[in-house]
Amino acid sequence: MYPRRAAARWIEGYVLLEFTVTKTGAVRDPKVLEAKPPGIFDRAALNASLKFKYKPKVVNGEPIEVSGVRNRITFELTDA
């Protein structure tokens, strides 16, 4: 969800996150690596990442956890 304050001021930006993808494909321990502008979209990006679902990596027929996964979330406004 776009932060209300940022939307009202037409602020756009991005957040680069790093997290672990669990054996079930869920996101665990997301953290902000980089954000522009800093502090504006961090919470929204962290909350969104916890809803992500990945297909877990499989090794020898078994799902495994993968740490250090990165995802950049971009926040852009459009004229609707």
Give the ranges of each region predicted by the language model.
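Short, small/polar residue-rich loop motifs at catalytic or cofactor-binding pockets
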Residues: W10-V15
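Conserved "boundary/linchpin" sites in short secondary-structure elements
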Residues: T22-E34, R43-P56, V66-A80
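Loop/turn elements at beta-strand to alpha-helix junctions within RNA-recognition modules
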Residues: A8, P38-G39
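Short, flexible micro-motifs
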Residues: L16, I64
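Short, basic/aromatic recognition patches
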Residues: M1-A8
